[in-house]
Amino acid sequence: MCGIAGFCNFHGNFREDPGKYYQILQTMGRVQKHRGPDGDGVYLQRHVGLSHVRLSILDPEGGAQPMVRQCAGQGGLRGAIVFNGEIYNSPALREELLREGAFFETTCDTEVILQGLLLRGLPFLSSLHGIFSFAFWEDATEQLILVRDRLGVKPLFYATLGQTFLFSSEIKGILSFPDFPAEVDREGLCEIFGLGPAKTYGKGVFKNVHEVLPGHVITLRRIMKDDEYRLSGKVNDSIAFEIGGTLRRRT
């Protein structure tokens, strides 16, 4: 079990005040420290920040996250990932990627995902067998994707605050972001008390905090010139409309 968190905003530059945003990332990780007592790390670029707390299982020395790699092929694409979970067919995928020109620095499954996405792109996701949630950032296209396993074993939540997109393994990571309102959703609370495990999938206690549904992908990218967010993938249409509308109104 590990913990991931982060934020993305295409309208600003987090690197203009790195101390502030490094501290925010560290806080988003620290509130989930029970998920990863063996290590922590952060990654900050102009439009994205990633945080990770780690429970070491595979490659304790080399598997630190966030993990950043540059692909030998595809024009040398560079990407970063924060990952929580286990890929059962990681050894087989590693052999396939080695034949395709990938170079591995560790033995952990995190790097298999990262190299696979850099080499094959999003179609690589269909090759993954396991339990997982992760966030992947690709530098050249300035694209962030959130992915959750088919059974929804590993949790992943997201929200927006103004023009900033937030995500975390646990809701407390989102609530730790400065000025994010911790407002109880009456309907969500009633479902928890009344229906328990039978509640509407993705419905939670806090307003404007959503759950990435099992087997779903959320893609966040900037449209050139218009500077808007584009949401795609298997995301609930009403949620996509709500997020997209909020961000457009604030552009």
Stretches with model-predicted labels:
Residues 1-251:
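Cysteine-centered catalytic environments shared across enzyme families
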